[in-house]
């Protein structure tokens, strides 16, 4: 799911091949069919205010116009068949980058329609992806247990190893300073990589055998995660190194993605087919 430019919230309905839009004020929903065989995974809002969808069923990136619901399809090259598309982010040039869990990452240039796919280091695993405020791109490899720094010109990747071996870097998000926060699924930790000096720090989440899945950093540089063992949304304050947990309304909830806008963090409860929001005091 992803907060939309018009105040609504986009979400993917993976089992029915649709993109949905929710009006949080009225509860009104509209759903847009994406085509036969569609299985949408992630959705983000692009610089054009359109919804951009990673569709593993169609093995394509989709653009959905927010005004007329027209769907434009950008198929992956034949060599990247079965890429198992996951997540996307836009770089500073307006180019969309995507991950495919079957061992792929790539880009779509909306201006030309060109689609490129690259084999990822260590094969299977590319999962979450993020852009920094400067438009640099990093992706997380769950199976590969690394953070990948993408050269947006050449498409080449530099592998960045977290201090904990086999950490299982699942999702990633940039803060306002360009530091990359990661959810370490195997290690039960949240980590941060600072490109300015190449340093890492890690903190273990509270509870027994924590499994952090999604990560999002709000406009205050507070870090939000989802934790599957406790079935909770977790707030981490880097300034005090303290955690606070919130129980979603649904049990089980299994929140697999977090995104937000000032004052709100939105999550998709995959086990309940619901969206959840945590509201907080936003920056002035």
Where are the regions that the model predicts?
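A short loop-to-beta-strand structural motif that recurs across blades of beta-propeller domains
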Residues: 18-20, 59-63, 103-107, 146-149, ...
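Short loop/turn segments that connect beta-strands within beta-propeller blades
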Residues: 23-27, 65-69, 109-113, 151-155, ...
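Conserved beta-strand positions in repeat-built beta-propeller and related beta-rich domains
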Residues: 10-15, 51-59, 96-102, 138-143, ...
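Solenoidal tandem-repeat scaffolds enriched in leucines and small polar residues
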Residues: 83-90, 96-152, 157-160, 167
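A short beta-strand motif characteristic of beta-propeller blades
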Residues: 28-33, 70-77, 114-119, 156-162, ...
């Amino acid at each position: 799911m992803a907060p939309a430019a018009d105040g609504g919230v986009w979400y993917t309905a993976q089992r029915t091949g649709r993109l949905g839009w929710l009006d949080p004020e009225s509860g009104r929903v509209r759903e847009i069919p994406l085509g036969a065989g569609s299985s949408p995974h992630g959705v983000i809002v692009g610089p054009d205010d359109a919804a951009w969808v990673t569709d593993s069923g169609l093995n394509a990136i989709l653009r959905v116009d927010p005004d007329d619901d027209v769907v434009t399809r950008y198929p992956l090259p034949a060599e990247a068949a079965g890429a198992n598309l996951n997540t996307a982010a836009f770089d500073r040039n307006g180019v969309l980058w995507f991950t495919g869990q079957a061992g792929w990452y790539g880009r779509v240039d909306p201006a030309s329609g060109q689609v490129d796919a690259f084999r990822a280091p260590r094969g299977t695993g590319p999962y979450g992806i993020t852009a920094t405020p400067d438009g640099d791109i990093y992706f997380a490899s769950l199976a590969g247990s690394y953070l990948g720094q993408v050269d947006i010109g050449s498409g080449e990747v530099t592998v960045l190893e977290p201090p904990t071996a086999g950490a299982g870097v699942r999702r990633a998000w940039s803060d306002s300073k360009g530091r990359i926060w990661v959810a370490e699924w195997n290690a039960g930790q949240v980590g941060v990589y600072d490109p300015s000096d190449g340093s890492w720090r890690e903190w273990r989440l509270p509870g027994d055998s924590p499994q952090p899945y999604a990560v999002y950093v709000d406009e205050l540089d507070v870090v939000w995660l989802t934790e599957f063992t406790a079935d909770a949304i977790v707030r981490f304050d880097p300034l005090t190194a303290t955690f606070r947990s919130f129980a979603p309304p649904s049990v089980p909830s299994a929140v697999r993605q977090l995104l937000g806008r000032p004052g709100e963090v939105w999550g998709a409860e995959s086990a309940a087919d619901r969206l959840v929001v945590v509201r907080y005091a936003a920056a002035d």
